[in-house]
Amino acid sequence: MTHSSSNEHEKEDDRRASDDMMDRDDQNAKEEQDVSKDAPPVNPWDPSQFPDGGFKAWSVVAGGFCSLFCSFGWINCIGIFQQYYQSDYLRGYSSSTISWIASLELFILFAGGLVVGRVYDRYGPRYILLFGTFMHVFGLMMASLSTEYYQILLSQGICSPIGISCLFTPAVNCIATWFRKKRGLANGIVAAGSSLGGVIFPIMFDRLIPRVGFPWAMRIGAFLILFLLIIANLTVVSRIPPMPKPITAKQYLAPFQERTYLLTTIAAMIFVLGLFLPINYIQAQAVEFGMDPSLANYLIPILNAASLFGRTVPGFVADKIGPYNVHTFMCFFSSVVAFALWLPAASNAPIIVFAALYGFGSGAFVAILPTLIAQISDIKEIGLRIGMEFGVLSLPALVSNPIGGAFVAHDNGGYRSCQIWTGCITMLGAILFVVARISLGGPSLMKKV
């Protein structure tokens, strides 16, 4: 009897102990829940929240690389089309008239940023990338069927670059949401895609056109672009959730009321007036000076191969000593190279060396410019402000190549005036970048800006 009573007491004690443990667990859970309610929500815009690495962040970089390979990489090979159209497909038209195709591509690429940047802020990158993929591939397919100047102008000069703008802007903007300390390096890697595209596409078309003809060369290029853009659509995402807000004129004008943003924009506009002229005319100029066409066909790939390093190495250095410092130096470097090598070049060697050095110097412009804007912008408005920057650059991009064509016509097919203009206008742009850099960080050369 005593033994039975003892067992009952032990069981009762166990039940009480178990109940006490459950009560404590419930109390702890309630306290944790209360703490979680009281804890402030995570702010994705806080500098400490930027991953600056990890699989997800670097997969966005990989997708952005593919996107710029297909968008700006295509733009970087405009020189081979200028030469081909002048000598064959559109040989009945003047150099200045043909250059409007490339100018429209650049204009729409940059002007699209005015709309695409704001749409990105409101809805994110997904639908923009899908629309851009369709328009770019469709435009190239239509160009493969074109036989008249106006048809190529509509397909390659308008339809395709609408898609390119929708591919370029979201890729650049998304990088800024994943990286802060390594933003220059990440932007440089993404921008390197445009350099590699500028290497692959000219060589590919130089080989394909004689073998399968212009129409099928364009179709093969379009299929390659479609494959890479599928990867971009699957990987390019923003870390920051979209913020649907009404668009007002004040939002578009606000950035230009900031002194540093305005000075940076003016400097970039001036620099762009000369930036693309060597890319567009170096191949035609080399053939005019007696370079074998089979060798001249490799000038654009050489230029873009060098820009691969110009987009990555300066971006890495910019993270260490400041993007404005590096960007300004590279702009001066490009201008000096134009004066020192392109202007006096009259044989193969200096033209080839110029292509390599100018590719390295000018490659940093597109790679670091978004980093400059991100540095002086609220991350919540990164899409609008980068879009506004590139949108304004559409104006000098539109007139740049026709101005170069007018100089060529003035020199009766020569390129001296065009070369002098390139050196002078890029030097002026570089000087204005110095002014913008001083506006942000003062005159000290040792300060990281």
Swiss-Prot record:
Keywords, ordered alphabetically: Cell membrane, Glycoprotein, Membrane, Transmembrane, Transmembrane helix, Transport
Catalytic activity, reaction form: erythrostominone(in) = erythrostominone(out); deoxyerythrostominone(in) = deoxyerythrostominone(out); epierythrostominol(in) = epierythrostominol(out); deoxyerythrostominol(in) = deoxyerythrostominol(out)
Major localisation: membrane
Disordered as annotated region, ranges: 1-43
Compositional bias annotation for Basic and acidic residues: 1-37
Single GO term (MF): transmembrane transporter activity
UniProt induction comment: Expression is dramatically up-regulated (29-fold) during the naphthoquinone-producing stage (on potato dextrose agar) compared with the naphthoquinone-nonproducing stage (on complete medium agar).
Biotech utility: Fungal naphthoquinones have a broad range of biological activities, including antibacterial, insecticidal, and anti-malarial activities (against the protozoa Plasmodium falciparum). Moreover, these pigments have a deep red color under acidic conditions but intense purple in basic environments; such color characteristics are attractive to the pigment industry.
GO cellular component, as recorded: plasma membrane
SUPFAM superfamilies: MFS general substrate transporter
Residues modified by glycosylation: 233
Protein localization: Cell membrane
Membrane-spanning intervals of the chain: 61-81, 97-117, 127-147, 152-172, 185-205, 212-232, 262-282, 298-318, 326-346, 349-369, 390-410, 420-440
Membrane topology according to the record: Multi-pass membrane protein
Family of this protein: Belongs to the major facilitator superfamily. Monocarboxylate porter (TC 2.A.1.13) family.
Protein purpose: MFS-type transporter that mediates the secretion of the 4 major naphthoquinone derivatives produced, erythrostominone (NQ1), deoxyerythrostominone (NQ2), epierythrostominol (NQ4), and deoxyerythrostominol (NQ5), as well as of 3 newly identified naphthoquinone derivatives termed NQ7, NQ8 and NQ9.
PANTHER family, A to Z: MAJOR FACILITATOR SUPERFAMILY (MFS) PROFILE DOMAIN-CONTAINING PROTEIN-RELATED (PTHR11360:SF224), MONOCARBOXYLATE TRANSPORTER (PTHR11360)
Protein name according to UniProt: MFS-type transporter 1
Source species: Ophiocordyceps sp. (strain BCC 1869) (Entomopathogenic fungus)
Chain's gene name: MFS1
